[in-house]
UniProtKB/Swiss-Prot annotation:
Enzyme class: hydrolase
Domain of life (superkingdom): Bacteria
Underlying gene: dcd
UniProt KW Transmembrane helix keyword: no
Organism this protein belongs to: Campylobacter curvus (strain 525.92)
Keywords, in A-Z order: Hydrolase, Nucleotide metabolism, Nucleotide-binding
Protein name: dCTP deaminase
């Protein structure tokens, strides 16, 4: 029970495909680090981004999201405009065990540059790529490096099984691939 170690993360990734692809060790020379760490896993950001723009002149509405609010970008380095926002996805695909919740926190390398990463919890039973929210809080353009680390995931095992997993309730982001924009079930 509690926070899970590198040995547990490695075992679950090999035996249950919890993280695919899985980086066995922390990779950190010349890149923003990624891979397994002592009590977590540093995820990588893919090379596709949706960057928020004011071209459409619309209001951001989570209940009725207008795709004109974002522009698509693919490349090794994404420039997030000053005081702006981008969406991306992990390279890794997650298969969360039914008794484990994961919490994701931004990496200090980016945080020290004014780049804040937000990811909501990975619920028990969730499967899919993770959509990553990236905020540039600075008055300057900011670089995000594709295929490198972006955030750290901590795995917490529950002391008893939950009654309903994300898979059981057919969560609206279950099995998401690519970058998923906001959804409201109707």
């Amino acid at each position: 029970m509690g926070l899970k170690s590198d040995a547990w993360i490695r075992k679950m990734s090999h035996e249950k495909a919890m993280i695919v692809p899985f980086a066995e060790e922390q990779v950190g020379r010349g890149v923003v680090s990624y891979g397994v760490s002592s009590y977590g896993y540093d995820i990588r950001v893919g090379d596709e981004f949706k960057i928020f723009t004011n071209i459409g002149g619309t209001v951001v509405d989570p209940k009725n999201f207008d795709e004109k609010n974002v522009v698509d970008f693919k490349g090794d380095v994404c420039i997030v405009p000053p005081n702006s926002f981008a969406l991306a996805r992990t390279i890794e695909y997650f298969n969360m065990p039914d008794n484990v919740l994961a919490i994701c926190l931004g990496k200090s390398t980016y945080a020290r540059c004014g780049i804040i990463v937000n990811v909501t919890p990975f619920e028990p039973g969730f499967k899919g790529h993770i959509t990553i929210e990236i905020s540039n809080t600075t008055p300057l353009p900011a670089k995000i490096y594709a295929n490198e680390g972006i955030a750290q995931v901590l795995f917490i095992e529950g002391d008893e099984p939950c009654e309903v997993t994300y898979a059981d309730k057919k969560g609206k982001y279950q099995a998401q691939e690519g970058i998923t924009l906001p959804r409201i079930l109707k």
